[in-house]
């Protein structure tokens, strides 16, 4: 990926600590295709303003870096240790966490440190490696989001067809193909990346494309393959998912109202063997418990064997005034949470990456104009948006998941177990405690219930 460079107006003028070059930085901050430096004259600012801007920038970088590393490491550990979370969707989430962790580790330090030091000190090998790994991580993140969108669309809208191929082995093959495709797509980065002198004792890691036409073609290609096409696929997939959920919600509400009126008219248990929503209209139906806990699952309701009648079932219950509407309201709340999470996913994807791709495309076709318009605070804000994408994905995909939160608590409890409480020992002249009448009656009831009649 390429981004415009912040100029000296951000942190002050002149090389050294607390200053940045007009086109210096890590692989995200690449120089022009021709290699010519076009620095703007530094704006005169007070020392207090420069120190405040530097402190704010370093603080934001540090917070985003810690959240990205900590959140993605937690996801990898929890998904790797918890057997209950080893599902197809979570396999893609694990790949997404690895790519986001790679983006944070391979990009942020090598972007911030050269800007603070005024030169790139890590050498040509690190320059090429960081540029390549950064591009691969961005590509894997985008393709992982697309894979998750397609997997959820298949699970919710096409459950019968998805059961044939929706396995963990198939997910593993898709993940491997995603990483291999991203690795091949980003080969031009290490080829055309090098460390170039930008002044006396000043080096910078930058791209040197053969011509302006090659650079423009590459920018448009990335804009289509890693932004527009994935964005359209995600928007269509999540739009169809939202439509399916709301249609199923309306059908469930009609079914509950009809069932309630039938029970009220008969004055007893509803009879008959009517078809469920999944059999009536061929759509997928989400159970309240699954939708409330997972938020991404769906199942086809299969006929189950009717349990034996109990004594409480012999008496026909009288339907309450809100017995039919409460399940519908619970499903409404659960499905609204699902749709809300899907909309957040799409909005954050466009929010974090639209400025980056727009700036790169603009710079490829009009470098001087883009540099004059975006240098300074705008490009710094764009940088923070791209880096924030590595820490918002864990929040959106995993911390809105109840089972993941419970797995986090279980993992923390396992890593930091509480010391067992010491039981008080009875005194030598003290009799041992005798079970009370309530304990004996509970024990007798448990024994009788366990043994059963006969």
From Swiss-Prot:
<feature type="glycosylation site" description="N-linked (GlcNAc...) asparagine">
    <location>
        <position position="30"/>
    </location>
</feature>
<feature type="transmembrane region" description="Helical; Name=3">
    <location>
        <begin position="132"/>
        <end position="150"/>
    </location>
</feature>
<feature type="disulfide bond">
    <location>
        <begin position="127"/>
        <end position="205"/>
    </location>
</feature>
<feature type="glycosylation site" description="N-linked (GlcNAc...) asparagine">
    <location>
        <position position="7"/>
    </location>
</feature>
<keyword id="KW-0472">Membrane</keyword>
<keyword id="KW-1133">Transmembrane helix</keyword>
<dbReference type="GO" id="GO:0008284">
    <property type="term" value="P:positive regulation of cell population proliferation"/>
</dbReference>
<protein>
    <recommendedName>
        <fullName>Gastrin/cholecystokinin type B receptor</fullName>
    </recommendedName>
</protein>
<dbReference type="GO" id="GO:0015054">
    <property type="term" value="F:gastrin receptor activity"/>
</dbReference>
<dbReference type="GO" id="GO:0004951">
    <property type="term" value="F:cholecystokinin receptor activity"/>
</dbReference>
<dbReference type="GO" id="GO:0007200">
    <property type="term" value="P:phospholipase C-activating G protein-coupled receptor signaling pathway"/>
</dbReference>
<dbReference type="GO" id="GO:0007204">
    <property type="term" value="P:positive regulation of cytosolic calcium ion concentration"/>
</dbReference>
<feature type="transmembrane region" description="Helical; Name=5">
    <location>
        <begin position="220"/>
        <end position="242"/>
    </location>
</feature>
<feature type="transmembrane region" description="Helical; Name=1">
    <location>
        <begin position="58"/>
        <end position="79"/>
    </location>
</feature>
<feature type="transmembrane region" description="Helical; Name=2">
    <location>
        <begin position="88"/>
        <end position="109"/>
    </location>
</feature>
<feature type="topological domain" description="Cytoplasmic">
    <location>
        <begin position="80"/>
        <end position="87"/>
    </location>
</feature>
<keyword id="KW-0807">Transducer</keyword>
<keyword id="KW-0325">Glycoprotein</keyword>
<feature type="topological domain" description="Cytoplasmic">
    <location>
        <begin position="243"/>
        <end position="340"/>
    </location>
</feature>
<keyword id="KW-0564">Palmitate</keyword>
<keyword id="KW-1015">Disulfide bond</keyword>
<keyword id="KW-0812">Transmembrane</keyword>
<comment type="function">
    <text>Receptor for gastrin and cholecystokinin. The CCK-B receptors occur throughout the central nervous system where they modulate anxiety, analgesia, arousal, and neuroleptic activity. This receptor mediates its action by association with G proteins that activate a phosphatidylinositol-calcium second messenger system.</text>
</comment>
<keyword id="KW-0675">Receptor</keyword>
<dbReference type="InterPro" id="IPR017452">
    <property type="entry name" value="GPCR_Rhodpsn_7TM"/>
</dbReference>
<feature type="compositionally biased region" description="Gly residues">
    <location>
        <begin position="265"/>
        <end position="275"/>
    </location>
</feature>
<dbReference type="InterPro" id="IPR009126">
    <property type="entry name" value="Cholcskin_rcpt"/>
</dbReference>
<feature type="topological domain" description="Cytoplasmic">
    <location>
        <begin position="402"/>
        <end position="454"/>
    </location>
</feature>
<keyword id="KW-1003">Cell membrane</keyword>
<feature type="transmembrane region" description="Helical; Name=4">
    <location>
        <begin position="171"/>
        <end position="189"/>
    </location>
</feature>
<feature type="glycosylation site" description="N-linked (GlcNAc...) asparagine">
    <location>
        <position position="36"/>
    </location>
</feature>
<feature type="region of interest" description="Disordered">
    <location>
        <begin position="422"/>
        <end position="441"/>
    </location>
</feature>
<dbReference type="InterPro" id="IPR000276">
    <property type="entry name" value="GPCR_Rhodpsn"/>
</dbReference>
<feature type="transmembrane region" description="Helical; Name=7">
    <location>
        <begin position="381"/>
        <end position="401"/>
    </location>
</feature>
<keyword id="KW-0297">G-protein coupled receptor</keyword>
<dbReference type="InterPro" id="IPR000314">
    <property type="entry name" value="Gastrin_rcpt"/>
</dbReference>
<dbReference type="Pfam" id="PF00001">
    <property type="entry name" value="7tm_1"/>
</dbReference>
<feature type="lipid moiety-binding region" description="S-palmitoyl cysteine">
    <location>
        <position position="415"/>
    </location>
</feature>
<feature type="topological domain" description="Cytoplasmic">
    <location>
        <begin position="151"/>
        <end position="170"/>
    </location>
</feature>
<feature type="topological domain" description="Extracellular">
    <location>
        <begin position="363"/>
        <end position="380"/>
    </location>
</feature>
<dbReference type="GO" id="GO:0008188">
    <property type="term" value="F:neuropeptide receptor activity"/>
</dbReference>
<dbReference type="GO" id="GO:0005886">
    <property type="term" value="C:plasma membrane"/>
</dbReference>
């Amino acid at each position: 990926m390429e981004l415009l460079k912040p100029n000296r107006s951000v942190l002050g003028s002149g090389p050294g600590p607390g200053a940045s070059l007009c086109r210096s930085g890590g692989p995200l901050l690449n120089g022009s295709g021709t290699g010519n430096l076009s620095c703007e004259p530094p704006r005169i600012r007070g020392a207090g303003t420069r120190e405040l801007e530097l402190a704010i920038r370093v603080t934001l970088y540090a917070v985003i870096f810690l959240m990205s590393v900590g959140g993605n490491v937690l996801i990898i550990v929890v998904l790797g240790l918890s057997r209950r979370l080893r599902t197809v969707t979570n396999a893609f989430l694990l790949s997404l966490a690895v790519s986001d962790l790679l983006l944070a580790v391979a990009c942020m330090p090598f972007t911030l440190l050269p800007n603070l030091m005024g030169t790139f000190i890590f050498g040509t090998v690190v320059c090429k490696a960081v540029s390549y790994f950064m591009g691969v991580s961005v590509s894997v993140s985008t393709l992982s989001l697309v894979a998750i969108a397609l997997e959820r669309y298949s699970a919710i809208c096409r459950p019968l067809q998805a059961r044939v191929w929706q396995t963990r082995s198939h997910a593993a093959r898709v993940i491997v193909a995603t990483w291999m495709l991203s690795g091949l797509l980003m080969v031009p980065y290490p080829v055309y990346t090098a460390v170039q002198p930008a002044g006396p004792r000043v080096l910078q890691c930058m791209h040197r494309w053969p011509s302006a036409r090659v650079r423009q073609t590459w920018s448009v290609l990335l804009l289509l393959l890693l932004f527009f096409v994935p964005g359209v696929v995600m928007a269509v997939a999540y739009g169809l998912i939202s439509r399916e959920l709301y249609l199923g919600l309306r059908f469930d509400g009609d079914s509950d109202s009809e069932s309630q009126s039938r029970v009220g008219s008969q004055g007893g248990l509803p009879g008959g063997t009517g078809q469920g929503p999944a059999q009536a209209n061929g759509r997928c139906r989400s159970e309240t418990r699954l939708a409330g806990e997972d938020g991404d699952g769906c199942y086809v309701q299969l006929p189950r064997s009717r349990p034996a009648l109990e004594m409480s079932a012999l008496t026909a219950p009288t339907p309450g005034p809100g017995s039919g509407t409460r399940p519908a309201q619970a499903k409404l709340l659960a499905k609204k949470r699902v749709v809300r999470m899907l909309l957040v996913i799409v909005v954050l994807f466009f929010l974090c990456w639209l400025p980056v791709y727009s700036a790169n495309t603009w710079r490829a076709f009009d470098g001087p104009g883009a540099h004059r318009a975006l240098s300074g605070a705008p490009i710094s804000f764009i940088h923070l948006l791209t880096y924030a994408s590595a820490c918002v994905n864990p929040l959106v995909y995993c911390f809105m998941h109840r089972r993941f939160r419970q797995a986090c608590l279980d993992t923390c409890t396992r890593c930091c177990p509480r010391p067992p409480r010491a039981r008080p020992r009875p005194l030598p002249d003290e009799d041992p405690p005798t079970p009370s009448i309530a304990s004996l009656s509970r024990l007798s009831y448990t024994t009788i219930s366990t043994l059963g009649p006969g």
